[in-house]
Amino acid sequence: MTPVRLLVTGGAGFIGANFVRYWTRNHPRDHVVAYDLLTYAGNLANLDDVRHRIAFVRGDIGDLEGAERTLREHHIDVVVNFAAESHNSLAVLDPGRFFRTNVIGTQTLLEAARRAGGIARFHHISTCEVYGDLDLDTDEMFHEDSPYRPRTPYNASKAGSDHAVRAYYETFGLPVTITNCCNNYGPYQFPEKVIPLFTCNAIDDQPLPLYASTRNRREWLHVVDHCRAVEAVLLEGRVGETYHVGSGVERSIAEIADVVLAELGKPESLKTIVPDRPGHDRRYLLDSSKIGRELGWKATIPFEQGMAETVKWYVDNRAWWQPLMDRAPVEEGTAWEEPVDAQSLDL
């Protein structure tokens, strides 16, 4: 295959950095540019082991001139858009920030790609949360043609970004694809998210905060399986199509806490109930049969194995996560804007 030149936005974040690492390992002839604003969840340390093999540009997807300039200077032909604000609880506190980044930012990046020209694929990463939620006591799941029913500012902002991507395909012919994914876990995940938060707290014998709605369930996918899915869509996916990326593995938040405590040999007394957040969705589950049928993809990392490896990674990499837990609040607009609240979790 002819080498390609990829721009990976959000490339210093959790999933983006894992994707950069995955792609450079499996496609060593390709030129990869990680593009990231380095807000609080972006971290250049996530790319330490591949920095010598990639280019890095600190940039904002909401900066039309900067994004277009980067696309032109690096002769980009594939854009993979991981850039997003994704913390549900912060979205309740500051909805405007999420709509600016996730909707306006995505539209601006699309426009930059349209103006730069030469884009063979614009791939957009989205979430199962755009569909709303499902009843706990049902076997229903979301399909690619399920209606959008977002219930929170974050969900609505991601839904808006999806619509912008489709509009640029229908109106301007930009060759796009979209994947909607379930909850990811794995190494380098910022410790505002539930699995690293539980793990880091438990390592230090600190409480594991569980929302009062402990029965709420999520579908869990290892980040490497997600990277494989995006690879499959980039290589073989049909332009204009949406593909769901899920594992079929559902666990409640209480069950996640139990797994973490068992892996670390910590007592259940560390679990503590905290007030629920507004708009907390009950359940998500994706029908991922389309990507399996058309592209031959399926999740391959068993949940138990993936969780054991993930917990061990955090045990072995305190030097990576401890500074994030300790970071004090700084002024708006600097590289790091939010400290980790050890009593708050994001799902």
Name the predicted role of every residue range:
Residues 139, 150-157, 187, 191-195, ...:
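The catalytic Tyr-centered alpha-helix of NAD(P)H-dependent dehydrogenases
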Residues 19, 59-62, 196, 202-347:
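C-terminal substrate-binding subdomain of Rossmann-fold SDR/epimerase-dehydratase oxidoreductases
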Residues 44-47, 134-138, 189-192, 256-258, ...:
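Short aromatic-enriched loop/helix-cap "lid" or pocket-rim segments at secondary-structure transitions
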Residues 42, 132, 186, 218, ...:
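Generic structural signal for helix capping and beta-alpha/helix-loop junctions
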Residues 1-184, 309, 314-319, 323-347:
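N-terminal Rossmann-like NAD(P)+-binding domain of SDR-like oxidoreductases, especially those catalyzing
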Residues 15, 41-42, 65, 189, ...:
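Residues that form or flank phosphate/diphosphate-binding pockets in enzymes
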